[in-house]
Amino acid sequence: MATFHFDLVSPEKLAFSGEVDQVDIPGVEGDFGVLAGHAPVVAAIRPGMLTVTAGGTQQKIIVLGGLAEVSEKGLTVLADVATSIEELDRAQFADTIAGMEARLTDKEGSELDKAIERLDHFKSIQSQLNTTAMH
């Protein structure tokens, strides 16, 4: 399988840089996969699980929003936050979700809608983490 260069950058660090076979991205308009030779595109990403496939192995990385750009040079993802599932403190993540739920009562209108949408994304990540832990 043909490979391409992939960089995953967050404000804190260069989370990943290397040649990969495929990257599956949680896009705002729907999840999408990138392979070598993909058409150029810029897409917003939502909080979710990004999957990197390289050399027959998969690495799952949690991203909390950002931007993905596919060009002739490869794929660059600029993530607001990027953490591998191995590095994630699951108890702290659960506490974050509980805090988000508690703060819903302070919001209304479009602010409430956005908070619920973000909470749903976080709960989806938590569900994926629980499923991943069972395999």
From Swiss-Prot:
HAMAP family with a match to the protein in the record: ATP_synth_epsil_bac
Domain of life: Bacteria
UniProt keywords, alphabetically: ATP synthesis, Cell inner membrane, Cell membrane, CF(1), Hydrogen ion transport, Ion transport, Membrane, Transport
Subunit structure: F-type ATPases have 2 components, CF(1) - the catalytic core - and CF(0) - the membrane proton channel. CF(1) has five subunits: alpha(3), beta(3), gamma(1), delta(1), epsilon(1). CF(0) has three main subunits: a, b and c.
SUPFAM superfamilies on file: Epsilon subunit of F1F0-ATP synthase N-terminal domain (SSF51344)
Gene encoding the protein: atpC
Annotated protein name in UniProt: ATP synthase epsilon chain
CDD domains linked to this entry: F1-ATPase_delta
Predominant localisation class: membrane
